[in-house]
Amino acid sequence: MDRCCVDVAAAVQLAAVAGGARRVILMGHSFGGAVAVRVGVGLSETVAGIATFATQSAGCEIAGALGGKPLLLFHGDLDEILPLQASEVVRAIAGSGEVVVCEGDGHLLAKSAEMMMAKLDEWIPATLFE
């Protein structure tokens, strides 16, 4: 996981910050959700918020260090790979955040795409420009 975090942090620094962005939102699915949380802790000045999709909780033990940073966790209630409780654990460790239950959806969250996009369309600007 550490190498993945280094890769994402480098991408944020090179692509986003060098391109003029002051703040970014990180997103990750499954294992990538844990990577996004860890990088969000490490780059706290640059990362405005984190959105995860069916994240695992392993690797998110440091989520408490997010310090109230906006955290949005989508998770299907029928996920057979990582149970909904994984996102609930991450939110509990972080001490804040919102778990959005994607009812009737599994790990890939395919049935919830429109709902998630609508939520992100509101959440991203509110998070970046708060």
Stretches found by the model and what they are:
Residues 1-18:
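Alpha/beta-hydrolase active-site loop
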